Amino acid sequence: MPNQHTLLLFNLLPVGSNISTWWNFGSMLLTCSALQVMTGFFLAIHYTANINLAFSSIVHITRDVPYGWIMQNLHAIGASMFFICIYIHIARGLYYGSYLNKNVWLSGTTLLIILMATAFFGYVLPWGQMSFWAATVITNLLTAVPYIGTALTTWLWGGFSINDPTLTRFFALHFILPFAIISMSSIHIMLLHTEGSSNPLGTNSDIDKIPFHPYHSHKDILMLTIMITTMFTIMSFSPDIFNDPENFSKANPLVTPQHIKPEWYFLFAYGILRSIPNKLGGTVALVLSVAILMTMPFTHTSYIRSMAFRPIMQLVFWTLIATFITITWAATKPVEPPFTIIGQTTSFLYFSFFIMNPLVGWLENKISFHS
């Protein structure tokens, strides 16, 4: 045993033989995480967390630092890839009932919240127009907290408006939170491996397991190759595809952009926020849009784990996916008809999924098992 090749030690990890490509996104997320830490480290070496120098330091990285443009673009595109993978990973969990493994699901949802915070802080760092105004709008939501809201906001800003102390602390937070992500990921993976992966059938895999290596290791490598190739292709041909044109202008507190909007991966939550015409209500809905995922293990009523054998729930699930895409699209549009009503309808449908989950489960049990 002591002389065994490291990969061969994965022979000790038995995995269900029928897990599909949807189970590959965990390893892809791990790779994204490693890539973000590496590129982020090289960017942090040259970045200056000062409101007068931050924007120039990004320009300096892109133009003057050897291969700085690769680091900067990979870090930006890597963030989008991270979110694409995590949303697919969550959708897989919802579809195949992976959330019934409570500890794994709750640690994963916590990971998502930390990741979203990290990405938000990172978006502020270039100190472009959209960075500044997105930070202003989102941090301002804290004032909606009863009694302590104003004090909380002033404390977060480090002053009475977004200024140099805010940028400095956001850089510090953006630097330290990835370590929290790495720690939580380790916990997430350890909790997963106490019970093992679920599978598309939602059955117990114990009767039919194969070694992780070479079968699943090669399967993972294929998807990783596709992901990295996609990233480098985007970086080479259209590196600014995910960027907002406003963010190429330095932050100016005196000029408000026409449409303040966050990066695409926050648009669904932003769409829900702005579909409620009340500050506190919108803030609560914004937090709930992610936190509501935590209710899934406790509202599962069906006798069947996977949606593969639940046609009514499949309809509800694909409605959720369509809703998610529609909110994302509607949130890029100005606040005027018909976009306001589209945003409100899709927000209602988004939350309806989590209410329908126990009801449809109960209905399916009635149809399938009590006829």
Curated annotation (Swiss-Prot):
ATP-binding as UniProt keyword: no
Positions that bind heme b b562: H75, H174
Sites where the protein binds heme b b566: H89, H188
GO biological process: mitochondrial electron transport, ubiquinol to cytochrome c
Annotated binding of a ubiquinone, by residue: H193
Stated role: Component of the ubiquinol-cytochrome c reductase complex (complex III or cytochrome b-c1 complex) that is part of the mitochondrial respiratory chain. The b-c1 complex mediates electron transfer from ubiquinol to cytochrome c. Contributes to the generation of a proton gradient across the mitochondrial membrane that is then used for ATP synthesis.
Name by which UniProt lists this protein: Cytochrome b
Organism placement in taxonomy: Eukaryota, Metazoa, Chordata, Craniata, Vertebrata
Name of the gene this protein is made from: MT-CYB
